Amino acid sequence: MAPRIPSIPSSTDLSGQSALVTGSNTGIGFENARQFLQLKASPVYLAVRSVERGQEAKKLLLDDPEVKKKNPGAVVEIYQVDMASFDSVAAFAQKFSEVKKLNIAVLNAGVSFFKYIPTSDGYETVLQVNYLSNALLATHLLPLLKAGAAASGKPSHLAFVSSNMQHMTSLKKNTIKPNENIIDWFNNRANFGMDRYNVSKLLLTGFTNELASKIDSSQVVINSMCPGLVATNFDTNSPWYLKYLMKGVRSLMARTPSEGARALTLAAITGTEGNGKYYSDGKETPSAALLLTEDGKAFQKKLWDQTLERIQQLDPTSPPPI
């Protein structure tokens, strides 16, 4: 059995705070939104690919007995975004900016594929959805989060859903040559591997580390976390033999979506001591060993610089994060 994720402190009260959760019409994103509502957050924004499914999720959330009891005036709003399209992310960001301020953002949307599938933007899907689009969206959300902090007098929170799979990649010290662009290297079909999901979470954690080191934690607390193995349909795109294997593993070890979502909620309510941290099982833990070495830190810095440059190329309206 997986270690138990700590309970959310009973004193937690998110009254007057707004929260955004991406990928929130199902699974741990849905349960994370439910937990925010039960903690009295409002409005809670669901950023989803399908508005119809988002509306179904909204009804389920507002019909939840505990939400009705603890947060009877709760507001849930639906926004459409497809993380496999940079234009969609930019359009969502522009529309969402109308809220003016935000207190909590949990970037949960992600995918897993075991074959190279390009998006309409010409990027490998897992690289784009799990990494580049999350980085792009984060730059758009930071001004809103800073405004939320200024209005509330306490730090806002930006939490990225990562994974312990970042510890298991084929990436080594000299895998990518100094003169090679990291994003282009991973976007090259010849460099695609079965560990692409793992790599995407390594990149996301590296970006999170750099971002957290550059933003004042009294304004925005930034961190990442792993919810662990959760009983969801996340492996829909896996080969049949992996689905069969994971079905057995999940029956023995998987957390419920509600339990997994607690990891997201806990990361999103930490104090400033949680800035730049990586959490697993609801507890602070080291990120991938590669990122902790001097070479890894240099890789992380290079990734940061090249990601910001690429984001500006993809979406010139993206505000500089620092």
From Swiss-Prot:
GO terms for molecular function: oxidoreductase activity. It comes from the Eukaryota. Keywords: NAD, NADP, Oxidoreductase. One of its GO terms (biological process) is terpenoid biosynthetic process. Induction: Expression is down-regulated by the cluster-specific transcription factor AOL_s00215g275. Expression is also down-regulated by the HOG1-MAPK pathway downstream transcription factor MSN2. The active site is at 197 (proton acceptor). Its EC number is 1.1.1.-. Pathway: Secondary metabolite biosynthesis; terpenoid biosynthesis. NAD(+) binds at residues 47-48, 104-106, 197-201, 230-232. Disruption phenotype: Abolishes the production of arthrobotrisins A to D and arthrosporol A, and leads to the accumulation of 11 new sesquiterpenyl epoxy-cyclohexenoids (SECs) and derivatives with diverse oxidation patterns. Shows substantial reduction in conidiation. Develops far more adhesive trapping devices and traps and increases the number of captured nematodes by the traps. Shows significantly increased ammonia levels in fungal mycelia. Pfam families: adh_short. The keyword NADP applies. Gene3D superfamilies: NAD(P)-binding Rossmann-like Domain (3.40.50.720). Belongs to the short-chain dehydrogenases/reductases (SDR) family. PANTHER family: PHOSPHATIDYLINOSITOL-GLYCAN BIOSYNTHESIS CLASS F PROTEIN (PTHR43157:SF31), PHOSPHATIDYLINOSITOL-GLYCAN BIOSYNTHESIS CLASS F PROTEIN-RELATED (PTHR43157). Short chain dehydrogenase; part of the gene cluster that mediates the biosynthesis of sesquiterpenyl epoxy-cyclohexenoids (SECs) such as anthrobotrisins and arthrosporols, metabolites that possess a novel hybrid carbon skeleton consisting of a polyketide-derived epoxycyclohexenol combined with a terpenoid-derived monocyclic sesquiterpenol substructure (PKS-PTS hybrid). The SEC pathway plays an important role for fungal soil colonization via decreasing fungal nematode-capturing ability. This is Short chain dehydrogenase AOL_s00215g274. It comes from Arthrobotrys oligospora (strain ATCC 24927 / CBS 115.81 / DSM 1491) (Nematode-trapping fungus).
